[in-house]
Every structure is written in structure tokens, then in C-alpha cells.
Amino acid sequence: MEIIYLRDEFIKLGQALKAAGFVESGVEAKEVVQEAKVLVNGEVDTRRGRKLYEGDVVSFENQTIEIKKL
């Protein structure tokens, strides 16, 4: 499980996927999100710009990101 620590109030889904190293680019993030391959808190979300807050959990290809505050 990867942990991303927030410096601000939120991080966008596409940015979180890139920060965790799950995708290499914003274009790739957009594709996997639009193809419904990403779960946020156990539900499919196709919005690359979805705001993630402390406590949110993102899953992609058997990998997980947990969002925490610094």
C-alpha cells in the first residue's frame, strides 16, 4: 500500500495515481480512469479530477493508495 500525504486540503485522482507511480503520465492516468479501472473507496470513479481527501482509498490493478494528512 502506498501512502500519499496531503500538503493541501486535497489531491486530484490523476495526480495521486502519478504520485504513487501507478501511471507514468497524465494521459495514462486519464485513460485508466476513463476506462473504469480505478476504484475510490470501493466504487468505480471515472473523474480524473475527483478530489481526494484524508481517509480516501484508491485501488488500481491490485495496488492501493491511502490518502493521509501530513
Where are these regions (language model features)?
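A positively charged, amphipathic N-terminal helix/segment that binds anionic biomolecules
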Residues: 2, 57-70
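A basic, amphipathic helix-loop patch mediating RNA/tRNA/ribosome contacts
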Residues: 9-54
